[in-house]
Amino acid sequence: MLMHSILILLVIIITTYFTRIWPFMVFNSKNPPNDFVRYLGRALSCSVIGMLVVYCFKDIHVLKPPYGINEITAFLSVILLHRIFKVFVLSITLPTILYMVLVQSHALEKAFFNIHVS
């Protein structure tokens, strides 16, 4: 059983490694990407962000507490941080951490709606 788990982990590690390194092997300085691939790189980044926003807000129930306050707080922190610093990694990482803390601690529910979660 342990050997089976180790083999599964190795396959996952190797597969992940090759999917990450593959673009660098295919598109190097000798073989730059064509215009279509460059276009996809620009267009898909915006599409992925849009998809993540929809995914973030899909389970909000606006008619019952906590009314999506955790999601809205994290979303507003993304906008604020990106307007101030204009650093994508910071704009994504800190609000993600904020959202996780808010969801797991139920801090906003306790503060604004007097909801006590055990």
Curated annotation (Swiss-Prot):
It holds the Pfam family AzlD. It is found in: Cell membrane. It is a multi-pass membrane protein. InterPro entries: Brnchd-chn_aa_trnsp_AzlD. Its main location: membrane. The chain crosses the membrane at residues 6-26, 43-63, 84-104. The keyword Lipid biosynthesis does not apply. Keywords: Cell membrane, Membrane, Transmembrane, Transmembrane helix, Transport. GO terms for cellular component: plasma membrane. Belongs to the AzlD/HI_1737/HP1330 family. This is Uncharacterized protein jhp_1250. It comes from Helicobacter pylori (strain J99 / ATCC 700824) (Campylobacter pylori J99).
